[in-house]
């Protein structure tokens, strides 16, 4: 039963991707005369290929930023203190907010007429245009919002790894005269590196779900600068009624996510063997 509930919609998506289904002509739902036409069309569609490239850029930017910010915050909070325990809890707030709420918060931050960020910049003599309306900054603006929402995930994983490091190597390094940078690079980083890799892979998979941010902040614009693959599939289905083609795009995304999941599984298995 559970397998049917899980796999049923995915199988139906795959079946639909093999048809030229369009709401303009619903009878094509059972037309399997050319089952690969949508996939052939996707691989020569410049807009689809651009959406894949945009997704790659956004995923890399968000994963790198989330790892850096999460690591930095975890290092700052890696002390036993009641005050810091309260601070850690506060840092989790963005991660537990509904994605649409996060998107609305950042919409307010980026719209120049109401944005406290833009008003502060204008007050100190640094007025800037809307970050989400500028083709050069729109993708970075989305990456910043996604980082704010999800860096607590990396922070939690790294913090847990840091607190499992035994005291002996740290004390030995301090006795040998290691500075903070040397202590981090030669002692802490080797311990937490596997955690960073796993956290990065999990966030890489999850980065394909930035749809609410893009829908609320930019609608894929300016132009197609922030049009990632899942948003392009949405446009093909809801705006143009090309459900077969949209399903093919979604199926390709599922295949990519499954591949990344397999990589995570292999890394986890290799780590257990090493242990």
Predicted regions and their residues:
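A structural signal for multi-pass alpha-helical bundles of membrane permease subunits
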Residues: 1-275
């Amino acid at each position: 039963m559970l397998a049917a509930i899980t796999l049923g919609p995915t199988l139906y998506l795959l079946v639909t991707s093999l048809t030229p289904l369009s709401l303009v002509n619903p009878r094509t739902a059972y037309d399997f005369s050319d089952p690969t036409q949508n996939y052939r069309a996707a691989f020569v569609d410049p807009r689809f290929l651009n959406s894949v490239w945009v997704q790659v850029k956004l995923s890399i930017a968000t994963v790198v930023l989330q790892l850096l910010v999460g690591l930095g915050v975890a290092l700052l909070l890696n002390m036993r203190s009641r005050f810091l325990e309260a601070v850690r809890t506060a840092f989790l707030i963005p991660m537990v907010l509904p994605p649409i709420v996060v998107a609305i918060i950042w919409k307010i931050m980026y719209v120049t007429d109401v944005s406290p960020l833009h008003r502060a910049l204008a007050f100190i003599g640094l007025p800037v245009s809307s970050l989400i309306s500028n083709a050069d900054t729109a993708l970075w603006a989305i990456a910043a919002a996604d980082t704010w929402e999800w860096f607590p995930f990396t922070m939690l994983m790294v913090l847990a790894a840091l607190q499992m490091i035994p005291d002996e190597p740290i004390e030995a390094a301090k006795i040998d005269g290691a500075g903070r940078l040397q202590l981090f690079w030669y002692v802490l980083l080797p311990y937490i590196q596997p955690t960073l890799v796993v956290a990065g892979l999990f966030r890489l998979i999850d980065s394909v779900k930035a749809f609410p941010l893009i829908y609320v902040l930019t609608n894929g614009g300016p132009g197609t600068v922030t049009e990632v693959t899942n948003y392009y599939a949405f446009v093909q289905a809801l705006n143009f009624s090309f459900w077969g083609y949209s399903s093919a795009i979604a199926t390709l995304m599922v295949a990519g996510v499954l591949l990344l999941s397999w990589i995570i599984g292999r890394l986890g298995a290799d780590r257990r063997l090493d242990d």
